[in-house]
């Protein structure tokens, strides 16, 4: 099979591509491209002009421990999207994974992370072949039946009481519509976001790009793929969440609220509740909470979201470190 591997570094160079996976879409490429500290790469494999596979990765600047030196990581949300028979997927993914590894090395990334696997065994042989190591992880997922009463029945009694009291005490739910609301939302979330939930928090431009993408017809049906929810009290944004929609699943990417100063409005609870009801109304089968931690230790955010009636599912993430000695050590520890 004579195949062609193509790399796209700029959104203006990306042609129209097939596929419905938002995590490997041109729309998400544009969002990353417009966010400071992010360098996206979109890979495609084609044969005789027909696209067989594609994958989107992004290099993020995550921390600065040493002055004038940036720590970078390369992240892929899944193993890509394929338009070929199942028996061709593994060799195609192996070719893309080799290119991703080389790209991360050129950009001096400290670690490569592949997460959101469709199944724990996805890409197993290719990861092993390219010296990646697995770490057991957890995911929390709510399942919908299409009935809003079913969502309420799955809640804990304390959650039902909190939602009822929040509405009674003046909490209002909606979606971000203006640039001022986007800015207020992102600043609120950054101030109140726990490092235990997610170590990387994007620049404000990330949320601005999402909002522009929702309104921009030039990047396809992105209005169906992203949504920013906000919780208000007396016209002030006190909470909110960001959802990304792909296939039959809604993914809660970010959520948070000003819980200490607005105890009676339960902003974090309302931010999640709004995402759940919207996903159900859209006809999604699942809502998955991203970044709920590993099974090795307690995780406050995981305990928080489990009270919305979701179930824990075992999965794994694959990593590769820049330092060979550290990567070899992890291969021994996690193999």
Which functions belong to the PLM regions below?
Residues 2-48, 52-65, 116-261:
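A conserved beta-strand-loop-helix scaffold within acyl/acetyltransferase catalytic domains
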Residues 9, 56-63, 125-150, 281-335:
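Active-site/acyl-donor-binding loops of N-acyltransferases
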Residues 58-79:
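Conserved acyl-donor/pantetheine-binding loop and adjacent beta-alpha core of acyl/acetyltransferases
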Residues 66-69, 107-110, 133-135:
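Short, flexible active-site-proximal loops enriched in glycine and acidic residues
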Residues 73-117, 122:
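A gly/proline- and charged-residue-enriched helix-loop-helix capping module
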Residues 83-87, 91-102, 208-324:
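Aromatic (often tryptophan-rich) hydrophobic motifs at membrane interfaces
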């Amino acid at each position: 099979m004579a195949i062609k591997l193509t790399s796209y570094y700029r959104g203006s160079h990306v042609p129209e591509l097939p596929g419905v996976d938002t995590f490997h879409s041109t729309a998400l490429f544009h969002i990353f491209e417009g966010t400071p500290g992010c360098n996206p790469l979109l890979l495609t494999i084609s044969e005789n002009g027909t696209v067989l596979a594609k994958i989107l990765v992004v290099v993020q600047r995550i921390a600065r421990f040493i002055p004038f030196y940036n720590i970078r990581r390369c992240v892929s949300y899944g193993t890509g999207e394929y338009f070929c028979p199942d028996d061709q997927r593994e060799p195609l993914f192996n070719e893309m994974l080799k290119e991703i590894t080389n790209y991360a090395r050129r950009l001096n990334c400290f670690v490569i992370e592949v997460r959101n696997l469709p199944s724990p065994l996805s890409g197993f042989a290719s990861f092993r072949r390219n010296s990646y190591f697995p770490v057991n992880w957890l995911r929390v997922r709510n399942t919908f039946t299409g009935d809003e009463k079913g969502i309420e029945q799955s809640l804990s009694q304390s959650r039902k009481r909190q939602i009822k009291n929040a509405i009674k005490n003046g909490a209002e739910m909606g979606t971000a519509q203006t640039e001022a609301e986007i800015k207020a939302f992102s600043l609120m979330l950054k101030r109140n976001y726990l490092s235990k939930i997610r170590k990387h928090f994007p620049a404000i431009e990330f949320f601005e790009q999402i909002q522009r993408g929702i309104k921009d017809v030039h990047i396809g049906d992105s209005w169906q793929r992203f949504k920013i929810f906000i919780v208000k009290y007396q016209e002030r944004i006190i909470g909110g969440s960001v959802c990304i929609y792909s296939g039959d699943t809604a993914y809660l990417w970010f959520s948070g609220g000003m819980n200490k100063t607005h105890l009676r409005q339960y902003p974090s609870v309302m931010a999640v509740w709004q995402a759940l009801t919207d996903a159900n109304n859209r006809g999604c089968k699942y809502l998955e909470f991203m970044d709920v931690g590993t099974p090795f230790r307690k995780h406050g955010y995981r305990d928080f979201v489990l009270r919305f009636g979701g179930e824990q599912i075992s999965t794994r993430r694959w990593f590769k470190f820049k330092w060979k000695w550290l990567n070899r050590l992890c291969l021994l520890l996690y193999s």
